């Protein structure tokens, strides 16, 4: 049934593409006549006809946009509740008969009888016809790949570099339906490769992502789709259609990467059903990572020329996903704080180390160590995270309503409603009637990425030259430690007092403090470092600067 629905959708797309082509030819003819004639009455008649044609074109493009927004047809048929993925429809092409052109070339270039190759030419034409409607499976990918490989041999056998063969390859834009044609075989190759990427998106979207196997298949498909679009972007220039322009392909690569990241998050949740404190923290960071990549895709989609090209429902769905996963990141943070208490001193230290790197900025109030050891403080911070989660869930639902097409998408509405209720239920569980304190603002969650401990990338990067950290021991004098500090993450030594303790120890201006008393502070705020220095006893403090 799904295959039938998908085929019907593709046939409707083909019909609309043909109608758009017809209307555009009529418009081109009318515009030529309007420019050529000087008769006032004829110009009025042509202008009226142009208005009708433009109106028809607008209606056809709106119908095509609705088809491109029909993502539900490509999703898995099971009753599983998953956030839908965005697949691409295939580019349509006209039928093409290369028989006469190839036979003529064989006669004139190779001096051979063209009729001897009737069978091979017919098989090639049958292959081209078949690849126009590939199945949504590995067999469909293999069919496109086989045709793509045959184009390599066709190019070398029959397409001399300085003389075109005399045939035109017609392809329609996958999103607007605008026709394009070129004599260059590179256009045919690029269009087939684009369809390979589009088919991978459809394969990825149809997977059952409630199983690890299904998620792995979806990840593989979306990664391969990203590879197809990336290869096109790097190797195909002067694209005649918008869907194969650099801006559009860059957007598609980012969209595929975001959908891969979403699948990685889903896989993590599937593989960790029995969560503990650290698993919940990591789930929150994985959700924050998904939110970040979708935010980047949304920014790309809202910049011209992509903004005026893609369906509005696409950019809206990406925006909804960004807010949805931001809400989930705060929900998992709240679960980590409220569902798990510390049991031993060693566990407290381990949790404190992990939690000290969890937020982008340190939460207001008591220190991390105190928060984790005090059940009431954990509940307060968890409540702040849940409050933010609920706000982001409601923002996602508000954005969802803005799109007429998304409002019809029951599965997305169901996911948003379910996660919103989940956060509300959690909030009511930890909310006490005697709570008179004002719930604070939960800080954003730091993304989980490798080499995080090396510090902020804007400072600790390969483009800057670094020496090994300088270890110095400072003892507090009448003027303190003899330096002034500025900035956050990392804190900068802004000035050195002449003759002071820091000057005598060899601390230089514009150095960064990376450690205080053995505690890493590359990500520390200004106030945290100052407090650590103030807490130093009579024996002084050991710091490391770079």
Where are these regions (language model features)?
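Non-transmembrane amphipathic alpha-helical segments
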Residues: 16, 23-33, 53, 60, ...
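PDZ-domain C-terminal substructure recognizer with occasional recognition of PDZ-binding tails
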Residues: 461-479, 529-546
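Eukaryotic intrinsically disordered, low-complexity segments enriched for acidic and Ser/Thr/Pro residues
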Residues: 1-15, 29-186, 210, 271-282, ...
């Amino acid at each position: 049934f799904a295959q039938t629905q998908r085929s019907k959708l593709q046939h409707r797309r083909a019909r609309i593409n043909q109608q758009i082509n017809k209307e555009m030819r009529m418009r081109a003819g009318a515009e030529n006549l309007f420019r050529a004639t000087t008769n006032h009455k004829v110009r009025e008649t042509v202008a009226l006809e142009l208005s009708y044609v433009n109106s028809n074109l607008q209606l056809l493009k709106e119908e095509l946009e609705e088809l491109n927004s029909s993502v539900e047809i490509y999703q898995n048929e099971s009753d599983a509740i998953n956030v839908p993925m965005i697949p691409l429809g295939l580019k349509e092409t006209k039928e093409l008969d290369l028989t006469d052109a190839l036979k003529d070339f064989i006669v004139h270039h190779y001096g051979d009888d063209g009729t001897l190759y009737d069978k091979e030419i017919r098989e090639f034409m049958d292959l081209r016809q078949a690849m126009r409607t590939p199945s949504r499976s590995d067999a469909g990918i293999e069919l496109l790949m086989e045709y793509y490989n045959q184009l390599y041999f066709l190019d070398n056998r029959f397409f001399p570099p300085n003389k075109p063969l005399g045939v035109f390859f017609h392809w329609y834009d996958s999103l607007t339906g605008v026709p394009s044609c070129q004599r260059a075989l590179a256009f045919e190759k690029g269009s087939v490769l684009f369809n390979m990427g589009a088919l991978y998106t459809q394969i990825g979207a149809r997977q059952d992502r409630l199983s690890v196997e299904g998620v792995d298949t979806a990840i593989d498909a979306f990664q391969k789709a990203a590879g197809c679009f990336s290869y096109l972007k790097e190797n195909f220039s002067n694209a005649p259609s918008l869907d194969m322009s650099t801006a559009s392909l860059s957007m598609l690569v980012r969209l595929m990467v975001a959908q891969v990241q979403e699948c990685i998050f889903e896989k993590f949740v599937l593989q960790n059903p029995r969560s503990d404190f650290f698993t919940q923290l990591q789930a929150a960071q994985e959700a924050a990572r998904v939110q970040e990549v979708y935010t980047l895709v949304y920014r790309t989609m809202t910049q011209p020329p992509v903004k005026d090209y893609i369906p509005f429902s696409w950019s809206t769905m990406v925006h909804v996903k960004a807010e949805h996963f931001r809400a989930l990141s705060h929900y998992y943070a709240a679960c980590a704080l409220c569902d798990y208490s510390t049991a031993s001193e060693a566990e407290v230290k381990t949790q404190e180390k992990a939690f000290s790197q969890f937020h982008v900025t340190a939460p207001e109030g008591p220190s991390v160590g105190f928060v984790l050891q005090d059940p009431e403080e954990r509940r307060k911070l968890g409540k702040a995270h849940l409050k933010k989660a609920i706000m982001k869930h409601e923002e996602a639902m508000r954005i969802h309503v803005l799109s007429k097409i998304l409002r019809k998408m029951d599965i997305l509405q169901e996911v948003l409603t379910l996660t919103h209720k989940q956060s509300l239920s959690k909030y009511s569980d930890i909310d006490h009637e005697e709570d008179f304190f004002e719930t604070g603002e939960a800080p954003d969650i730091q993304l989980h990425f490798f080499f995080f401990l090396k510090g902020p990338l804007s400072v600790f990067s390969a483009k800057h030259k670094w020496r090994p950290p300088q270890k110095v021991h400072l003892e507090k004098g009448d003027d303190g430690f003899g330096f002034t500090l500025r900035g956050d993450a990392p804190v900068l030594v802004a000035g050195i007092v002449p003759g002071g303790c820091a000057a005598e120890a060899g601390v230089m201006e514009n150095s960064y403090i990376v450690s205080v008393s053995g505690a890493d502070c590359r990500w520390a705020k200004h106030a945290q470092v100052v407090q650590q220095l103030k807490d130093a006893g009579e024996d002084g403090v050991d710091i490391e600067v770079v």
